[in-house]
């Protein structure tokens, strides 16, 4: 039985045979007829499926990388697909371009195109998290670039062991880390820092909170007048439903994070050294996303401190409605098929952009300088 959490085959037992599991059975056992499908009465050996590993050279590398990405919960094979160094800003620009092309070709309504493109710009912000950056190590022949905003790197530069160990703290490691969850929580952190009464955050319950006397952080005079980067302004200009859709697409673009935000087995084994609690998919309360540029030519997005409050059920005094409630609202508003369609478009655009070997202009300029 294929174990999606551990990324390996395990002996099949009754408790592991669950709906949706991939089971490997000896072809000599029979039980399958090519004309009728599964047939417990059939004793004829089953024709062998073409061995993917032995025919790797004949298979498109992007398809192979996508399959590997789907086969485990914490792999990043798409990030090594292009064999080139790329920053988050460069990759995000390429994904946004592919999204625009796909959205136009499929005839999406303009407002859906806008939200899909906005999600493309934000989708990989979580790669700035020190756990993801720590997975890029470099080699003696290909040293690591001294940056904290890398999104892509050659295959040989990715750590094969201790995959998500921090660069600046060898004792801190986050097995099972998912960068898209960090991206999602970063969006909530931005609203919380810049506009706590935003309609997508605490706005609908302002009177309730004020009546309860809940202390909420107010913007300083400097923050209130400071002009946000254009990308951040687009996010702040979203209404509640638009923000939730953008956030959902950011979270779901690898199919690993959707409605449920809960700890995995590797999170449960985390050796906590402080009072911040266990991680969820490798992200902990009070983790920081550093200030990075997401759009070439625009000012960087400010540093934020993440909170896991959206994962709790019920109303949060930090982020308002729970993530599960938001997702249920999206399903009621758009329907599951429309959400799946938009998610598929962003994922397709991400895979297309990950194939590109075009040089990153910012790294080319840096190397020239």
Pin down the residues of each PLM region.
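Short linear motifs at secondary-structure transitions and domain/linker junctions
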Residues: 1, 94, 319-322
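Acidic/His-rich, divalent-metal-binding segments that scaffold phosphate/diphosphate chemistry
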Residues: 3, 8-166, 188-202, 208-209
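Long, highly charged alpha-helical interaction/scaffolding segments
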Residues: 36, 42-53, 337, 341-346, ...
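N-terminal cationic amphipathic segment used for targeting or macromolecule association
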Residues: 63-64, 365-367
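Divalent metal-dependent catalytic cores for phosphoryl transfer on phosphate-bearing substrates
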Residues: 85, 109-365
